[in-house]
């Protein structure tokens, strides 16, 4: 139930797309969108109608990300009880000449035209790691921010970057094999389960590109902190050691300034919020430095 029109449509589309990619990646198979609202819900803070064409776009997005179809909730509006004003294919009027009914019909007609896509898969050379255990442990760790770690926001920043380049993304967990991927992103992977660092090391040794972030490799799968430095098991792979992490107030920002003549030609200053990792170089080269 994405909240279309609450923010820029492209931002909602990125959020929705990542959810689809996660569902597809859980089993590596096509999925069904079980509940698609034809118009507006009745339980969100504002019951916003989908603008003309938005139901079609939402349905086709699911197909493009590996879906097999879109099922609706609900077919017919009830006359009473808690969901009597929830969107439906057939409203209280009961006719087939409504705007919503025609939009639903258009989706069905299009699915017939593209039925050869049924059973096909999405090929991705990039994977992002999302781990529920790590998220739960991180959010209950009592530091470095007890309110607002913004984990999903960090995930979406990585995801948007890939999608803006037209790159398909699988959203995987620590048990997945990595052989088919060229790039692996690890946003805020607080918990490294047993053997995970070794798997990542092997991925890099075999030519894979690793992208990670602050607050990664901090604790094991019992939420006990690793000793002898973090990110655990990857300090030599990344060429850094995390020495401290600074939790910023909501109103506070830091900024990063490119080093003159840096290898990537970076020339813009970027702001950062919430968390700032202080690192010690152990073989890595500096591209940017923090201003504060």
Residue ranges and their predicted role:
Residues 2-292:
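Carbohydrate-binding surfaces of carbohydrate-active enzymes
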């Amino acid at each position: 139930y994405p909240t279309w029109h609450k923010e820029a449509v492209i931002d909602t589309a990125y959020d929705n797309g990542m959810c689809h990619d996660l569902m597809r990646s859980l089993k590596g198979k096509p999925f069904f969108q079980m509940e698609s609202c034809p118009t507006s819900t009745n339980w969100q803070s504002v019951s916003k109608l989908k603008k003309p064409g938005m139901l079609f776009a939402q349905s086709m997005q699911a197909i493009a990300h590996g879906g097999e179809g879109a099922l609706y909730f609900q077919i017919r509006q009830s006359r009473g009880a808690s969901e009597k004003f929830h969107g439906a294919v057939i409203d209280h009027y009961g006719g087939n000449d409504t705007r919503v009914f025609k939009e639903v019909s258009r989706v069905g007609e299009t699915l017939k035209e593209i039925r050869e896509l049924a059973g096909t898969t999405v090929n991705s050379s990039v994977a992002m790691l999302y781990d529920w255990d790590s998220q739960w442990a991180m959010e209950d760790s009592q530091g470095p921010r007890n309110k607002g770690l913004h984990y999903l926001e960090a995930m979406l920043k990585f995801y948007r970057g890939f999608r803006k380049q037209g790159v398909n993304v699988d959203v995987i967990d620590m048990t997945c094999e990595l052989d088919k991927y060229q790039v692996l992103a690890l946003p805020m992977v607080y918990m490294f389960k047993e053997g995970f660092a070794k798997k990542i090391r092997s991925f890099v040794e075999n030519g894979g590109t690793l992208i990670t972030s602050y607050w990664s490799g901090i604790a094991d799968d019992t939420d006990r902190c690793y000793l002898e430095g973090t990110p655990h098991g990857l300090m030599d792979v990344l060429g850094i050691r995390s020495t401290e992490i600074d939790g910023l107030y909501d109103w506070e920002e830091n900024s990063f300034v490119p080093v003159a003549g840096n290898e990537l030609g970076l020339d813009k200053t970027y702001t950062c919020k919430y968390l700032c990792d202080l690192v010690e170089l152990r073989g890595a080269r500096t591209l940017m430095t923090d201003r504060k």
